[in-house]
Regions:
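STAS-like cytosolic regulatory interaction modules
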Residues: 1-41, 50-89
Length: 89
């Protein structure tokens, strides 16, 4: 499981993106991003999650987000990408 940090904004996205790329490759067939710690974020968090999804699917793995904050789900809907980022309880 990939654990998202408490803050994932434009300022931290580039650094975290590198870490996430490596983590996706090390995951088994199902890649799950745990967003339970995420409290401060902007649209960069969506970009990171979409990139993670793209990498997982390219590697033949499934992708989902666990415990996404309501505001993140709202932001995904606003940008029209809510259907691309499956959220589990």
């Amino acid at each position: 499981m990939l654990k998202l940090p408490a803050a994932l904004t434009h300022e931290s996205a580039a650094d975290f993106s590198q870490t996430l790329r490596q983590a996706v490759l090390s995951q088994p067939a199902e890649v799950v991003a745990d967003a339970s710690a995420l409290t401060e974020f902007d649209s960069s968090a969506l970009a990171i999650l979409l990139e993670c999804r793209r990498q997982a699917l390219a590697a033949g793995k499934s992708f989902s987000v666990q415990a996404a904050p309501p505001r993140l789900r709202q932001l995904a809907g606003l940008y029209g990408v809510g259907g691309l980022i499956p959220v589990t309880a």
